[in-house]
């Protein structure tokens, strides 16, 4: 018989830098799981992706055991890295902070494809292009 799921917790944590301090400690501690065990396992899995934020979806069971899956970095972070900017525009409809090429857009869309609700790469590109537009990044 399958274990009964107690909770599903979603966190965005810098790769290889999980520690029991807030926000991770309180989010997981209230469900009674081994926080250090999670941090160690997460850091081992994400050590190769240092410098990026990697979302994790942690499934916590009634017997206080857990499993987790890591997702691809947020599209906004990938776009900022490709454009070479620290932050998006405060007024995206009026000011453009950077420009990225269609090739860079396709590369980001192919990385994010498995996490997006898109049928093909063109659909994924449109989703990522919308994110870029809302950040004040122009695609040419």
From Swiss-Prot:
CDD domains: Ribosomal_L11. GO terms for cellular component: cytosolic large ribosomal subunit. Disulfide bonds: none annotated. GO terms for biological process: translation. This is Large ribosomal subunit protein uL11. One of its GO terms (molecular function) is structural constituent of ribosome. Part of the ribosomal stalk of the 50S ribosomal subunit. Interacts with L10 and the large rRNA to form the base of the stalk. L10 forms an elongated spine to which L12 dimers bind in a sequential fashion forming a multimeric L10(L12)X complex. InterPro entries: Ribosomal_uL11, Ribosomal_uL11_bac-typ, Ribosomal_uL11_C, Ribosomal_uL11_C_sf, Ribosomal_uL11_CS, Ribosomal_uL11_N, Ribosomal_uL11_N_sf. Belongs to the universal ribosomal protein uL11 family. One or more lysine residues are methylated. The gene is rplK. The keyword ATP-binding does not apply. Keywords: Methylation, Ribonucleoprotein, Ribosomal protein, RNA-binding, rRNA-binding. The keyword Cell membrane does not apply. PROSITE patterns: RIBOSOMAL_L11 (PS00359). Coiled coil: none annotated. Forms part of the ribosomal stalk which helps the ribosome interact with GTP-bound translation factors.
């Amino acid at each position: 018989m399958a274990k009964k799921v107690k909770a599903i917790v979603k966190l965005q944590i810098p790769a290889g830098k999980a520690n029991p301090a807030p926000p991770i400690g309180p989010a997981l501690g209230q469900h009674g799981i081994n926080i250090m065990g999670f941090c160690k396992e997460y850091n081992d899995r994400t050590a190769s992706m240092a410098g990026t934020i990697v979302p994790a979806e942690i499934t916590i069971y009634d017997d206080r055991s857990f499993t987790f899956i890591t997702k691809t970095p947020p599209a906004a972070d990938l776009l900022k890295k490709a454009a070479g900017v620290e932050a998006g525009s405060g007024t995206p409809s009026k000011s453009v902070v950077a420009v990225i090429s269609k090739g860079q857009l396709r590369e980001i869309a192919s990385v994010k494809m498995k996490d997006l609700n898109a049928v093909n790469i063109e659909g994924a590109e449109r989703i990522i292009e919308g994110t870029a537009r809302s950040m004040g990044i122009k695609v040419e």
